Amino acid sequence: WSFSVTAIRKGYSKLPSNVKRWINQYIGLNAILSTLEHFTGWIEDGIYQACKRAGMPDWMAWTVAKALTLIAL
């Protein structure tokens, strides 16, 4: 999800300011994306730490965290 949020933010930043203002006023896109980005990162970090505590090597814990986050979120 964080990759999607980054891509949306990049495209959003290229919009004219009046369009961004309208989107923020009626949709609150920035707030939605910030919340999604925050919780997605928080969940992914939690999964990663749990995998590390279970004895997985870094690469495996990272892969499992990314895969589970992609599937679940």
Describe the residue ranges of each PLM region.
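Mature secreted bioactive peptide module from preproproteins
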Residues: 1-73
